[in-house]
């Protein structure tokens, strides 16, 4: 299968191709797709192949590649996440395969749009010039630049799919590399040092369980309670919540959200938005809205609190269940002592609600935005599977909640400084055990916004930039602990990460977005 020659050596003498060739030459040549060469394709196809190559080259040169999904090797207009990759080995009829391809294309469309928006002005202008020089038959004539780029991407995909064997190739190539560096593990003698890390993890797990076992009234407190409540309506209709969730679970589209009313999804997020009770002892305990400062680094504005949200999915018990992910951001984790390896700029708490078929909570879990400190809080609907006889990390179950109704909210008790989760309490009110004559509580509200907004943040100069680099990390949030944990294979342990890049086990391999994660550790509890 021939690739597209470098445009510096051959190109039709047309206005469109000249503009496209200029864009490619500036950024460098790119490998072409599977579907043929400029000499044996219609001009519109050739122009689109070159446009996509030019855009990819400009994105790479500018360092604005979105790292939340993986490219499907050999198919430049498809991307894949762990959920969609989990279907690749399963039988698919033509309709199912078409839906799956459409979902892969949707991931690329989303990421490509972010990358195009985040290009530096000069690079973006080169692509815009090339787009506007496209002939009408390239697709989406008269539409905006994004729409014309997408039309070309669809045309390139059609060429790739027409190649014999493309279906089998796509299914074998639709994989997501894990976020563990095997070379680092080899250099760090992980087969030996892993036992030391495992011993440390067991100590952490024991201490964490002991902390959760403390009576509420005895929880350590360094400051005053800051109760942070969602600004959205607080009395969701359980029947409506159940209907919305059931509609999502019952859909077999890739992804199911494609058939969901966005307003209904917003209602789900509003219904399950938690209340936070934060032990506030310093400015570091004041959450807020993430923005890019004048120095280009991530900062938090405490004047207005925005919790970022994401709709995710897990495959459990024969169903695809919706997951509501909320992230609360703090300006920093201050050092508890000189040289604290866990301290650093930007901090947070990620809270995930997995809904059952009827829309009621099935299990909660939480991580730090770096992927560390993964904890599970199942409801009584689930029972933990017996732990495997291995040194690898299992599910750290810190608390079990009673059965909860659809729309039930919870209150999260958050520690000062570390911002660790200390307790999960059904309801929205600060419990009596945490109150008293010497206890004051400030009450404020927060709004929610999709976490995709963090991939396109105003940069202060009229453009936008992703909070996350092409490696999926937030620059400037590195922690000294990375020099301790590098032999585990996790790159820059402690640094904040983009969704899809959260490795959550130092010993073993585990990712927060694994589609069978809940099934790996839990089974349905026996009914009484």
Residue ranges and their predicted role:
Residues 13:
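Acidic, contiguous segments within the catalytic cores of piggyBac-derived transposases
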Residues 16-28:
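Bacterial N-terminal signal peptides
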Residues 34-243, 345-347, 358-528:
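Domain-length functional cores that host ligand/cofactor binding and catalytic or interaction surfaces
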Residues 30-32:
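Bacterial signal peptide processing site
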Residues 286-364:
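Short N-terminal edge-element motif at the start of the domain
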Residues 1-10:
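N-terminal secretory signal peptides that target proteins for export/translocation
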């Amino acid at each position: 299968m021939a690739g597209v020659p470098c445009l510096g050596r051959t190109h039709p003498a047309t206005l469109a191709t000249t503009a496209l060739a200029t864009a490619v030459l500036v950024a460098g040549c790119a490998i072409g797709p599977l579907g043929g060469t400029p000499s044996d394709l219609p001009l519109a196809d050739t122009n689109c192949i070159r446009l996509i190559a030019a855009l990819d080259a400009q994105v790479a040169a500018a360092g604005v590649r979105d790292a939340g999904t993986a490219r499907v090797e050999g198919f430049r207009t498809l991307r894949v996440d762990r959920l969609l990759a989990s279907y690749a080995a399963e039988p698919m009829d033509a309709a199912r395969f078409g839906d799956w391809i459409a979902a892969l294309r949707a991931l690329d469309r989303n990421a490509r749009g972010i990358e195009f928006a985040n290009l530096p002005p000069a690079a973006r202008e080169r692509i815009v010039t090339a787009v506007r020089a496209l002939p009408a038959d390239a697709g989406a004539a008269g539409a905006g630049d994004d729409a014309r780029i997408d039309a070309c991407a669809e045309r390139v995909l059609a060429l790739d799919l027409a190649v014999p064997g493309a279906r089998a190739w796509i299914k074998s190539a639709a994989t997501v590399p894990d976020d563990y560096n095997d070379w680092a593990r080899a250099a760090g003698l992980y087969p030996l040092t892993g036992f030391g890390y495992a011993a440390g993890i067991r100590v952490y797990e024991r201490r964490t369980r002991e902390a959760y076992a403390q009576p509420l009234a005895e929880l350590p407190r360094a400051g005053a309670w800051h109760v942070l409540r969602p600004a959205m309506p607080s009395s969701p209709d359980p029947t409506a919540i159940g209907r919305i969730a059931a509609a999502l679970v019952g859909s077999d589209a890739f992804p199911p959200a494609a058939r969901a009313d966005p307003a209904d999804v917003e209602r789900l997020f509003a219904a399950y938005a938690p209340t936070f009770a934060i032990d506030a002892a310093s400015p570091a305990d004041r959450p807020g809205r993430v923005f890019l400062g004048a120095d280009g680094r991530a900062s938090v504005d405490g004047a207005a609190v925005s919790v970022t949200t994401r709709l995710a999915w897990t495959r459990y018990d024969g169903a695809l269940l919706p997951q509501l992910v909320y992230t609360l951001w703090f300006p920093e984790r201050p050092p508890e002592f000189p040289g604290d390896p866990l301290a650093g700029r930007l901090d947070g708490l990620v809270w995930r609600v997995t809904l059952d078929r009827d829309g009621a909570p099935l299990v909660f879990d939480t991580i730090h935005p770096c992927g560390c400190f993964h904890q599970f809080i199942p409801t009584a609907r689930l029972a933990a599977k017996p732990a495997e006889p291995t040194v690898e990390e299992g599910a750290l179950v810190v608390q079990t909640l009673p059965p909860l109704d659809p729309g039930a909210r919870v209150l999260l008790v958050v520690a000062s400084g570390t911002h660790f989760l200390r307790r999960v309490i059904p309801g929205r009110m600060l419990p009596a055990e945490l109150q008293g004559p010497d206890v004051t509580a400030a009450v404020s509200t927060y709004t929610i916004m999709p976490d995709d907004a963090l991939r396109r943040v105003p940069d202060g100069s009229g453009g936008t930039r992703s909070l996350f680099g092409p490696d999926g990390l937030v620059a400037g949030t590195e922690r000294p602990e990375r020099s301790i944990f590098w032999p585990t294979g996790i790159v820059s342990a402690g640094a904040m990460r983009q969704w899809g890049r959260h490795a959550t086990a130092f010993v073993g391999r585990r990712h927060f977005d694994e589609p069978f994660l809940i099934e790996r550790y839990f089974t349905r509890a026996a009914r009484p």
